[in-house]
């Protein structure tokens, strides 16, 4: 089955029945998912100038003074023009009209309920050493360990590295293992198929993933296709539409998967999603994925010590992925405004729109990230900041894993899949052009949240306030600019490339970028304000240069 993405996009652009198209797709695959200015006395403003002056040989006294500023920072007082009560901001969306949340009285086509789903998470320094005991408890004696070559190389030089600790635990518990390390950074259909094939040749009773999102997503896919091989080995069977067929995963996977993250962004240890880049022919490709609650790891071992070997640029990219998870989750369309209404409970999508449970996790994740990302990037040995960043990533995963993400991620898939001549620093052993996921996500964020702010100004103002904005004299019309400015400040602080032009894109590429975004229904349908072709074109244009 060959699908050319430009044809899909053109059809969507010309169609006058986009809403019906989305509804048909949703019913066909209900489990599709993903994917204000600082004041002069602002702590982050002071940090900005301090951070830019630091060199690789950082002065310890400078660091301590900088960290002290963060630890002593206090929330900015609530605004006078817009009085924000967090619980009211959350509850008013869902419970302002109780008829919208009632099966008997809701006669429309929107949903009336949400479902909170989470897997088991164990957090703490050293929990990686427990993986062998957990596998024994699950009656696993022969497992396949997924990782990447960079992490595997550390085994010989660092006995406290994540893979070294995992293998030590397996050997101590007498568990046989086979290592698969050919995971591709930003996986493709080709790399997924290779992992599926290798796993299928062994008689494994358990799966372990040690790495970032690419590793964990590869392990999920290999486990799925070996648990329920599709008819005629049709790889597109479980892939989200309109790229794939979007068939429902039949049931729980046949081998338990334990995920051990080594980055602080994707939160793949908490979600039932795996993302890949699919080649479509004619030199075109598209980011898409597989989504099902059955894909969630049975256990996530979240060990902050596994971030000690994380390169700073990878940490920054991971942090921005985490940031957008929190922002997009909290601003996604509310669950009771999402349509179509499911025909049965098992057709309710795992990415179901913002809801009271996802809001709690997303807001807390954002608070933790804003207080600690600078400290962590400047000093990975800061135990507190490192632990907070690791835990915040899982919090964000618990949030967006139940609500979803929207425009930033939807746009990022065409940005990363259409990469030109760009290789980021800090991604060792990279053999292909690559735009890191977190980088591709954050570059559109300033424009996106200006666009979505009118859908719910209070929610956007609350996010801006958490990020450090002074909203004391803010009005609802200021919400988008205030939040956008805070995001830009953080991007400058951490030296993110200045827009899509810095990655090699030109204005002549925007049409292709838009057409690559339009089919990403699994995330764009969760936008609180739906975007047309022209809207997306402007969002990409505004993201070309940011500073």
UniProtKB/Swiss-Prot annotation:
One of its GO terms (cellular component) is mitochondrion. GO terms for molecular function: alcohol dehydrogenase (NAD+) activity; hydroxyacid-oxoacid transhydrogenase activity; metal ion binding. It catalyses: (S)-3-hydroxybutanoate + 2-oxoglutarate = (R)-2-hydroxyglutarate + acetoacetate; 4-hydroxybutanoate + 2-oxoglutarate = (R)-2-hydroxyglutarate + succinate semialdehyde. It is found in: Mitochondrion. The keyword Nucleotide-binding does not apply. It is an enzyme of class 1 (oxidoreductase). Transmembrane segments: none annotated. Its EC number is 1.1.99.24. Keywords: Mitochondrion, Oxidoreductase, Transit peptide. GO terms for biological process: glutamate catabolic process via 2-hydroxyglutarate. The keyword Nucleotide-binding does not apply. Belongs to the iron-containing alcohol dehydrogenase family. Hydroxyacid-oxoacid transhydrogenase subfamily. PANTHER family: ALCOHOL DEHYDROGENASE (PTHR11496), HYDROXYACID-OXOACID TRANSHYDROGENASE, MITOCHONDRIAL (PTHR11496:SF83). Catalyzes the cofactor-independent reversible oxidation of gamma-hydroxybutyrate (GHB) to succinic semialdehyde (SSA) coupled to reduction of 2-ketoglutarate (2-KG) to D-2-hydroxyglutarate (D-2-HG). L-3-hydroxybutyrate (L-3-OHB) is also a substrate for HOT when using 2-KG as hydrogen acceptor, resulting in the formation of D-2-HG. This is Probable hydroxyacid-oxoacid transhydrogenase, mitochondrial. It comes from Dictyostelium discoideum (Social amoeba). The gene is adhfe1.
């Amino acid at each position: 089955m060959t699908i050319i993405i430009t044809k899909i996009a053109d059809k969507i652009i010309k169609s006058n029945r986009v809403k019906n198209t989305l509804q048909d797709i949703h019913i066909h695959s209900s489990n599709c998912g993903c994917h204000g200015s600082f004041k002069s006395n602002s702590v982050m403003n002071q940090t900005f100038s301090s951070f830019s002056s630091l060199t690789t040989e950082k002065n310890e006294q400078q660091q301590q003074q900088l960290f002290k500023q963060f630890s002593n920072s206090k929330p900015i007082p609530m605004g006078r023009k817009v009085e924000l009560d967090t619980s009211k901001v959350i509850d008013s969306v869902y419970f302002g009209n109780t008829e919208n949340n009632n099966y008997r009285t809701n006669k429309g086509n929107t949903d009336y309920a949400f479902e909170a789903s989470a897997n088991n998470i164990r957090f703490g320094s050293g929990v990686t050493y427990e993986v062998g005991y957990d596998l024994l408890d699950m009656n696993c004696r022969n497992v396949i360990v997924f990782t990447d070559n960079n992490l595997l190389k550390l085994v010989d030089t660092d006995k406290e590295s994540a893979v070294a600790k995992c293998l030590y635990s397996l050997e101590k518990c007498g568990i046989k293992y086979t290592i698969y390390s050919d995971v591709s950074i930003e996986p493709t259909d080709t790399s997924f198929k290779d992992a599926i094939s290798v796993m299928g040749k062994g008689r494994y009773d358990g799966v372990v993933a040690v790495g970032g999102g690419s590793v964990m997503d590869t392990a999920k896919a290999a486990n799925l296709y070996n648990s329920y091989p599709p008819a005629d080995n049709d790889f597109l069977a479980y892939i989200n539409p309109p790229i794939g067929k979007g068939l429902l995963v039949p049931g729980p996977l046949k081998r338990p998967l334990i995920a051990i993250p080594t980055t602080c962004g994707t939160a793949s240890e908490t979600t039932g999603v795996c993302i890949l880049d699919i080649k479509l022919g004619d030199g075109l490709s598209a980011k898409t994925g597989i989504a099902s609650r059955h894909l969630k790891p049975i256990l996530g071992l979240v060990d902050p010590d596994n971030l000690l070997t994380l390169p700073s640029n990878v940490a920054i990219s991971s942090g921005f992925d985490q940031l957008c998870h929190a922002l997009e989750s909290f601003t996604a369309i509310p669950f009771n405004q999402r349509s179509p209404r499911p025909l049965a409970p098992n057709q309710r999508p795992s990415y179901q729109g913002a809801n009271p449970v996802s809001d709690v996790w997303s807001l807390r994740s954002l608070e933790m990230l804003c207080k600690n990302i600078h400290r962590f990037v400047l000093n990975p040995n800061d135990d507190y900041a490192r632990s907070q960043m690791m835990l915040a990533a899982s919090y964000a995963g618990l949030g967006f894993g139940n609500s979803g993400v929207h425009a930033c991620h939807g746009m990022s898939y065409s940005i990363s899949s259409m990469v030109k001549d760009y290789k980021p620093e800090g991604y060792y052993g990279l053999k292909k052009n690559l735009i890191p996921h977190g980088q591709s996500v954050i570059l559109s964020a300033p424009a996106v949240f200006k666009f979505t702010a009118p859908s719910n100004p209070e929610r956007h103002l609350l996010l801006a306030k958490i990020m450090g904005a002074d909203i004391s004299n803010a009005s609802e019309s200021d919400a988008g600019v205030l939040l956008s400015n805070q995001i830009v400040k953080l991007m400058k602080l951490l030296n993110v490339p200045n827009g899509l032009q810095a990655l090699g894109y030109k204005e002549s590429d925007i049409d292709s970028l838009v057409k690559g975004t339009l089919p990403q229904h699994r995330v764009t349908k969760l936008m609180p304000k739906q975007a047309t072709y022209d809207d997306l074109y402007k969002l990409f244009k505004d993201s070309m240069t940011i500073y």
